[in-house]
Amino acid sequence: MAHKKGAGSTKNGRDSNAKRLGVKRFGGQRVKAGNILVRQRGMKFTPGLNVGCGKDFTLYALTDGIVNFDYKNAQQKRINIIG
């Protein structure tokens, strides 16, 4: 019986590209309409005042203003654009 594995293909050796998720604009930062605030999987952050949500759950600014983070309730973080 051979003690070496044959030179066939392996089932491992794959990895997906990083998706660059996360917060892109932080609290207190000035933003313009259309700026991306958060890239996320699922609704980790919920859209608040003057914030829109894309089909991939990306949150973006609807108006110019300053980013503000708060809590909708004990679990859910919300992002607003003030002013």
Curated annotation (Swiss-Prot):
Residues 1-24 are annotated as: Disordered. GO terms for cellular component: chloroplast; mitochondrial large ribosomal subunit. GO terms for molecular function: structural constituent of ribosome. This is Large ribosomal subunit protein bL27c. Belongs to the bacterial ribosomal protein bL27 family. InterPro entries: Ribosomal_bL27, Ribosomal_bL27_CS. Its main location: plastid. It is found in: Plastid, Chloroplast. GO terms for biological process: translation. HAMAP family: Ribosomal_bL27. NCBIfam families: L27. Keywords: Chloroplast, Plastid, Ribonucleoprotein, Ribosomal protein. It holds the Pfam family Ribosomal_L27.
